[in-house]
Amino acid sequence: MNWPNMRFIILLLVYAHIFIFANSTFSLSAESSDFTMKGQKGEMKKFFLHSQPVSIDKLPVLQGDNTEFDLMKQGYNVILVNFWATWCRPCVEEMPSLDKLQSLFDPHKIKIITIATGRNNQKTITNFFSKHMIVNLENFRDPKGSLATKLGIFGLPASIIISPDGNEIGRLIGPIDWIEADVVEFFESLLL
């Protein structure tokens, strides 16, 4: 094997190791510092509720016209932010149920925002939403992944729930069926 090919393989292995280590480190810290709610069932077993809310000052994303937009300044009651990518199969599979979940709630009370992380251009996102008939969700972009990195998102899909006072109250890493009864009940409980 020649040196350029060997160098590429070594570099690929180093990046894979870093990616795996970063995800496992984050998962361990999430499990040790967070707790699940007593009696969680079904898909909500995957949700980690923070023991202390985590303050978030800004959520800067790009709109379709490439202008910056701060999600924290919109005055929603509860925000579910879903980080995803068009190339991420689990993201693609969960998106229709996420769209259905938004249809069940007044968007001024519970707002579901999707943020395409990484190299997802607006045309590709728009085509994806059209092809999969996603009509209830707003889409934004985090093209450099800087917001995802700032929030400790190292795998996709990932979702965080933000309270009206701007604090992250919990997160979920991985796909779920967003219209399972336990999930819907959880979001209904946030409105009480």
Language-model segments: residues:
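Short pre-active-site segment immediately N-terminal to redox-active cysteine/selenocysteine motifs
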Residues: 77-79, 83-87, 155
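A short beta-strand-turn-helix
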Residues: 58-79
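C-type cytochrome heme c attachment motif
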Residues: 86-93, 158
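N-terminal targeting signals for export/organelle localization
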Residues: 1-60
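Structural microenvironment flanking redox-active thiols in thiol-disulfide oxidoreductases
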Residues: 93-132, 143-149
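Hydrophobic beta-strand anchors of alpha/beta hydrolase catalytic cores
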Residues: 80-81, 112, 159
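Thiol/disulfide oxidoreductase modules built on the thioredoxin-like
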Residues: 127-135, 141-189
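Loop/turn elements at helix/coil->beta-strand transitions in domains of secreted/extracellular proteins
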Residues: 75-78, 108-111, 136-137
